[in-house]
């Protein structure tokens, strides 16, 4: 960016191959590093001197021999283009995620109105889908906690599915802002808090769709937040991580057989 780029991103050059490296980070806790082989994409002014930029980059980084390609990006209606990439998502025939610019496919369903935005959770990711499908199967929900609420999608779904009282917490202040905005758009009354201000009450259901590393550390907190006989649902877990998570939570929960979707896992259980 210091060399004049309008925007820049770094991606794993081995993404979607066997050599792909999974690196995650949380707000305030950045990932430990970047990948061994990277693709850097920069957006530049149309008249930018790419050769001079690469020369400066080599001087700054002491790395030489960059291979590169350029592409001219034509002016478009970027809002319309972005909107065209998001369609209503069917979780079950009776539960849909619908962007604001779309009509709900069926008015008889529970429709969660949600646009892509500041925080994770639009319904398209397998972990979100797993949690939403599980929530839709719960016959009775009184008090529900969404720990690591992101966009608030799980909390909003719980409320629309009939939960009496729903609370959401997140470490990221932007997620709390996004959740409150989305709840207002869906006309549901939900309390969202920064996790530092969260009062550790007990709930009938605790759902957490966050990174597995965070789930490992937060196991005592999540267990304390769930009443005896209550249920937990955890996701954000890769299939290779499910045994370690199940073992960690078995101290407090009778853990069910994991549910797997596209390499991601939903771990559920009942509080002992």
Regions found by a protein language model. Give the residues of each.
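N-terminal auxiliary segments of SAM/dcSAM-dependent transferases
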Residues: 2-106
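A short hydrophobic/small-residue beta-strand
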Residues: 7, 165, 232-233
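Short beta-strand micro-motifs in enzyme catalytic cores
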Residues: 38-40, 110, 265-267
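Short aromatic/hydrophobic contact patches that present stacked aromatics
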Residues: 39-41, 119, 207
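Surface-exposed loop/turn positions
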Residues: 93-95, 142, 230
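A short, charged helix-loop
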Residues: 110-116
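Conserved SAM/SAH cofactor-binding pocket of Class I
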Residues: 118-202
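S-adenosylmethionine
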Residues: 171-271
């Amino acid at each position: 960016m210091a060399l004049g780029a309008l925007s820049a991103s770094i991606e794993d050059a081995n993404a979607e191959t066997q050599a792909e490296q999974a690196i995650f980070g949380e707000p305030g806790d950045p990932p430990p590093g970047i990948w061994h082989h990277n693709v850097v994409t920069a957006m530049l002014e149309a008249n930018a001197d790419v050769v001079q930029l690469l020369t400066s980059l080599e001087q700054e980084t002491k790395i030489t021999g960059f291979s590169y390609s350029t592409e001219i990006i034509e002016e478009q209606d970027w809002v319309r283009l972005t909107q065209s990439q998001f369609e209503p998502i069917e979780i079950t025939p009776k539960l849909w995620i619908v962007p604001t610019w779309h009509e709900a496919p069926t008015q008889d369903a529970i429709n969660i109105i949600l646009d892509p935005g500041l925080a994770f959770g639009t319904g398209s990711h397998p972990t979100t889908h797993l949690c939403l499908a599980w929530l839709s199967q719960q016959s009775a929900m009184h008090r529900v906690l969404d720990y690591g609420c992101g966009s608030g999608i799980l909390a909003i779904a719980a409320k629309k599915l009939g939960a009496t009282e729903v609370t959401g917490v997140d470490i990221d202040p932007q997620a709390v802002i996004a959740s409150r905005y989305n709840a207002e758009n869906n006309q549901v009354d939900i309390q969202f808090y920064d996790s530092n201000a969260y009062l550790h009450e007990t709930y009938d259901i605790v759902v957490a769709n966050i990174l597995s590393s965070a789930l490992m550390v937060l196991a005592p907190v999540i267990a304390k937040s769930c009443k005896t006989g209550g249920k937990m649902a955890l996701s954000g877990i890769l299939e290779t991580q499910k045994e370690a998570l199940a073992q960690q939570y078995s101290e407090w929960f009778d853990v069910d057989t994991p549910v797997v979707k596209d390499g991601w896992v939903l771990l559920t259980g009942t509080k002992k």
